């Protein structure tokens, strides 16, 4: 299936049905009172997150989604039927925003999450509501309200804990296929990966994390060159970026340090927030380097790159160094979750001070 991670749709809710202005007319009851029923509410358009869907391709071609109108009220106190709702199933990780106002309507982050995109109009009142002691035969009724109509932008940002960053052919797909259950296409030419791949890395029976592999970046990606710029948004939800570098390129004219710097520059141009995320350097393809030269090669790269953060050297092909990297990632993610939990549990000191001041003022009074 083709991977589509952006779409534009129109959601049109149903109009409410009109209220009825009718009177009871039966044999031997020539002047019965009002019996006009209310109109039914219009159908609404909902979005629901579904973990079994991983692309927005259905919305690339079906752009207009219309809910039914509510039925009009009728005599004999008959209320109009409500219009049928429309529920659109979308991938988990879809961000929905209003194209006219720019407002973010919803961020579907959990399976089953249900959000109203366009609300149906309320049904109008029948003349039964207007009966009073002074107006026994009201002829007024209320028309139904129109339903909402919205132009919406859908953006899919995959939910992953770790994102892989690097030049084409750096070995990202080989790495994710070695450590996870993902089976991306792997070949010895650039741009083998054409869309994001997700892999679940199981550390043990109870612990796992999700890795996202996006197409490789090239210089000028932030301005639209290559493929990777289209998919950088999929790294925005991650808690850690792995910058994978081919430390032993076949072309001797290629400088791995220059390529690594180019990737980081593209990242900064695209999104400062993404640039500021925790990032680890992973030097890949050490199996190609003679064992006696590896330490010197790594040391030289780190020195010329002026890198101060964590460094890992692996061979994604043979698996050398991958286990240590996986366990380091697990510990890092666990620490992040612990920090988030502590931040949520931390009391609001300012609120406590305000409450204390209120109590003190009350005691003075």
Swiss-Prot record:
Keyword list (alphabetical) reads: Cytoplasm, GTP-binding, Hydrolase, Magnesium, Metal-binding, Nucleotide-binding
Protein location: Cytoplasm
EC annotation from Swiss-Prot or TrEMBL = 3.6.5.-
- What biological-process terms (Gene Ontology) are attached? ribosome biogenesis
What GO molecular-function term can you cite, just one?
Answer: magnesium ion binding
Q: Which Pfam families match?
A: GTP1_OBG (PF01018), MMR_HSR1 (PF01926)
Instruction: List, for all copies, the residue spans of the domain called Obg.
Output: 1-159
Q: Which InterPro entries match?
A: G_OBG, GTP-bd, GTP-bd_Obg/CgtA, GTP1-OBG_CS, GTP1_OBG_dom, GTP1_OBG_dom_sf, OBG_GTPase, P-loop_NTPase
The entry describes its oligomerization and partners as: Monomer.
The protein's job, in short, is: An essential GTPase which binds GTP, GDP and possibly (p)ppGpp with moderate affinity, with high nucleotide exchange rates and a fairly low GTP hydrolysis rate. Plays a role in control of the cell cycle, stress response, ribosome biogenesis and in those bacteria that undergo differentiation, in morphogenesis control.
Q: Which family does it belong to?
A: Belongs to the TRAFAC class OBG-HflX-like GTPase superfamily. OBG GTPase family.
According to UniProt, the name of this protein is GTPase Obg
Supply the source organism for this entry: Cupriavidus metallidurans (strain ATCC 43123 / DSM 2839 / NBRC 102507 / CH34)
């Amino acid at each position: 299936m083709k991977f589509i991670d952006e779409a534009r749709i129109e959601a049109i809710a149903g109009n409410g049905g009109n209220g009825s202005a009718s009177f009871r007319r039966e044999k031997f009851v020539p002047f019965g009172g009002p019996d006009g029923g209310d109109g039914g509410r219009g159908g609404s358009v909902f979005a629901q997150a579904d973990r079994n869907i991983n692309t927005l391709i259905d919305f690339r071609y079906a752009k207009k989604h219309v809910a039914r109108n509510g039925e009009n009220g009728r005599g004999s106190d008959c209320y109009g039927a409500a219009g049928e709702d429309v529920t659109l199933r979308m991938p988990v990780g879809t961000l929905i925003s209003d194209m006219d106002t720019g407002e973010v309507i919803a961020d579907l982050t959990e399976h089953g999450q249900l959000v109203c995109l366009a609300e149906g109009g309320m049904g109008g009142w029948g003349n039964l509501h207007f009966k009073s002691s002074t107006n026994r035969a009201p002829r007024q009724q209320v028309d139904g309200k129109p339903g909402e109509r919205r132009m919406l932008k859908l953006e899919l940002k995959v939910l992953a804990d770790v994102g892989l960053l690097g030049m084409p052919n750096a070995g990202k797909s080989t790495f994710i296929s070695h450590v996870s259950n993902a089976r991306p296409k792997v070949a010895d030419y650039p741009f083998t990966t054409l869309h994001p791949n997700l892999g679940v890395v199981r550390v043990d029976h109870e612990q796992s994390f999700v890795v996202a592999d996006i197409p490789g970046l090239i210089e000028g990606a932030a301005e639209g060159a290559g493929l990777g710029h289209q998919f950088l948004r999929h790294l925005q939800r991650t808690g850690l970026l792995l910058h994978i570098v081919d430390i032993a390129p076949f072309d001797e004219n290629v400088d791995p340090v220059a390529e690594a710097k180019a990737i980081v520059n593209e990242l900064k141009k695209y999104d400062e927030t993404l640039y500021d995320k925790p990032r680890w350097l992973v030097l890949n393809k050490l199996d190609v380097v003679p064992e006696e030269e590896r330490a010197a090669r790594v040391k030289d790269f780190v020195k010329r790159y002026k890198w101060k953060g964590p460094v890992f050297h692996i061979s994604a092909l043979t698996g050398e160094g991958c286990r240590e990297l996986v366990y380091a990632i697990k510990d890092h993610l666990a620490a992040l979750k612990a920090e988030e939990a502590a931040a949520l549990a931390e009391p609001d000191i300012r609120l406590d001070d305000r409450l204390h001041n209120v109590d003190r003022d009350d005691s003075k009074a």
